[in-house]
């Protein structure tokens, strides 16, 4: 696993979290 992969995963997770809170 690369750092870029982890970063994209984190961004996806935070984005879905924000969308769910709306």
From Swiss-Prot:
Keywords: ATP-binding, DNA damage, DNA recombination, DNA repair, DNA replication, Nucleotide-binding. GO terms for biological process: DNA recombination; DNA repair; DNA replication. One of its GO terms (molecular function) is ATP binding. Belongs to the RecA family. Important in genetic recombination, DNA repair, and replication. Possesses pairing and strand-transfer activity. Interacts with dda and gene 32 proteins. This is Recombination and repair protein. It comes from Enterobacteria phage T2 (Bacteriophage T2). The gene is UVSX.
């Amino acid at each position: 696993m690369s750092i870029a992969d982890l970063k994209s995963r984190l961004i996806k997770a935070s984005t879905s979290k924000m969308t769910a809170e709306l």
